[in-house]
């Protein structure tokens, strides 16, 4: 009897581990429904534009603000010396933050 229950219990545990979010499906995300209500009050009859506004409002609530990319100016490149210029030329200005100044 014990050997019959072992495979079924093991498979049940495996399914529970593969789908951990299914137990939390009962909870409703109220921030999305509140954002929808606010958009309907602000701009009625917008059509698909209203949907885009809702998507951006929900996205704004869920994601942290992004920092702007690091900009390397020519004057900074020249002031840091030849090794920095070689590094920037090799990696590109986007990744120049990790280049050594050589000082």
Curated annotation (Swiss-Prot):
A Pfam short name: Sperm_Ag_HE2
Entry GO terms, CC? extracellular region
Glycosylation: which residues?
29
The free-text tissue note of the record is:
Specifically expressed in caput and proximal corpus of epididymis (at protein level). Present in the epididymal epithelium and on the sperm surface, with a subacrosomal equatorial distribution on the sperm head (at protein level).
Statement: the UniProt record of this protein carries the keyword Glycoprotein: yes
Q: Which GO terms describe its biological process?
A: antimicrobial humoral immune response mediated by antimicrobial peptide; cytolysis by host of symbiont cells; defense response to bacterium; spermatogenesis
- Keywords in UniProt for this one? Antibiotic, Antimicrobial, Defensin, Glycoprotein, Secreted, Signal
Which branch of life, at top level? Eukaryota
Q: Which InterPro entries match?
A: Sperm_Ag_11A_B
Annotated signal sequence is 1-25
The answer to keyword Glycoprotein applying to this record is yes
| Cellular location(s) | Secreted
Q: Which family does it belong to?
A: Belongs to the SPAG11 family.
Question: What does the UniProt function comment say about this protein?
Answer: Has antimicrobial activity against E.coli. Plays a role in the defense response in the male reproductive tract, contributing to sperm maturation, storage and protection.
Designated name of the protein: Sperm-associated antigen 11B
- Name the lineage: Eukaryota, Metazoa, Chordata, Craniata, Vertebrata
């Amino acid at each position: 009897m014990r050997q019959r229950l072992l495979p079924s219990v093991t498979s049940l545990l495996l399914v529970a581990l593969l789908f951990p979010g299914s137990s939390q499906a009962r909870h409703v995300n109220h921030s999305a429904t509140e954002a929808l209500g606010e958009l309907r009050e602000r701009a009625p009859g917008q059509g698909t534009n209203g949907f885009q506004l809702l998507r951006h409002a929900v996205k704004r609530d869920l994601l942290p603000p992004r920092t702007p990319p690091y900009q390397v100016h020519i004057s900074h490149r020249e002031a840091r010396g030849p090794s920095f210029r070689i590094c920037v030329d090799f990696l590109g200005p986007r990744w120049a933050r990790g280049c050594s100044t050589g000082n």
